[in-house]
Amino acid sequence: MIKSIWLVNKYAMPPQYESRLRTIKFAHYLQEMGYKVTIFGSSVMHNTDIDLIDDGSKYIKRQYGDLSFVHIKSCQYKKTAGVHRVWSDIQFHYRLVKLAQKFEKPDLVVATTFPLISNPLLKYCHRHGIKYITEVLDWWPDDFVDFGLVSAKNPIMKYLFKVAQNNYVKSDATVFSIKGCYKYFEDKRWDTFHGGPVDLSKVYYINNGVDLADFNKWKDENKIDDDDLKSDTKKVIYLGSVRLANNVGQFVKAAEQLKERKDVQFLIYGDGDDREPLIMYCEDHHLTNVKFKAKWIEPKYVPFVLSQSYLNILNYTAHFGKYGISSSKMFQYMAAGKPIVCNVDIMYSDILEHQIGICHDMKDEQEYADAIRSILDMPQDEYEAMCMRAQAAARDYDYPFLTKQMVEVIEKL
């Protein structure tokens, strides 16, 4: 019987830094259900300059409330992709395997990350009779191809695809946070029905979510004194990275189409390579209706910020959601009880399924602006009904419910 679990996620961080809540919420609720859980994450806090280890130690143990962490020393990196980040990933996973004997042997490892070139932790688990679940939260290495960075026929990509496929085959189970995972395997013809090696009976779908108890508590207890949030304008909020994959420039240009409206304010929270160029664009084009706010918000303040919006934005490059999405902020948007506009077509769209906004490919900024305007000018009774549907939809993605789904997978091993 499985009782002791390692949750391995290089990017898992202590609660005060963590905006991607999946790992720490699973840890919390798995423990409530009787499991012993240890989280293994990097010493480096992603997208920050913070390194929790500064004395040459290979690892440190830390307790954050009921969360038991082991932070593995990893090298710093500045960019979201690049040699230093790849090396940091490799270093973390190989160092974890080297140090593994220092910790109590688990019955199960749930690994959310592994270095692209190989998977030493999976091999370690096989050698020591430990069950292994792969968690997949994005489409690496496919993103390299989807963003046009490299051809799928590139020899390196062929190797990386083979590594990923082998990982799915040799894991005891694979849990995707993206609903289109089954179609993904079918399209690649990796599933056994199409002659491939991947048994889809060992593949499961559990999306990301939101902890509604925390969200509602934090919304009431952690408020920000901010004139923009207190204003009577209808606030259209984007929260997230400001980089290539998020295509925030299209959102800014859509806001430009609405610059004559004095009743609307566009607020952008987040950081990334595109932030400064977009700030300059707004200054050059005198866009006073667009404001770039904090580069980073402590998670406990996010619920209040989103609760002050009139409309929230999901923004991506074309074709991003071809198998669905698992954006944590989408579920926070739902919990805030506000409509959502997304600028790309998403397969298995929760926005369309629950009728809580607009979601389709926006061919240009004018079409994007028209979509935003349609929510802003919606009759009040229709708007309030949409808000209520958003809150109701969030219940399907409450972390206690999602954890029960994970336990069902664990009990099948």
List the predicted regions and their residue ranges.
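Conserved donor-binding/catalytic core segment of Leloir-type glycosyltransferases
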Residues: 175, 210-212, 227-246, 251-255, ...
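Nucleotide-activated donor-binding/catalytic signature segment of Leloir-type glycosyltransferases, i.e.
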Residues: 269, 276-304
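N-terminal subdomain of nucleotide-sugar transferases
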Residues: 1-61, 179, 256-258
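Carbohydrate-associated surface elements
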Residues: 180, 209, 296
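Acidic donor-binding loop of glycosyltransferase active sites
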Residues: 172, 304-323, 338
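Membrane-proximal helix-turn-helix segments that form the acceptor-binding/catalytic region
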Residues: 25, 97-98, 118-127, 154-176
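A short, well-ordered alpha-helix in the C-terminal region of glycosyltransferases
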Residues: 381-396
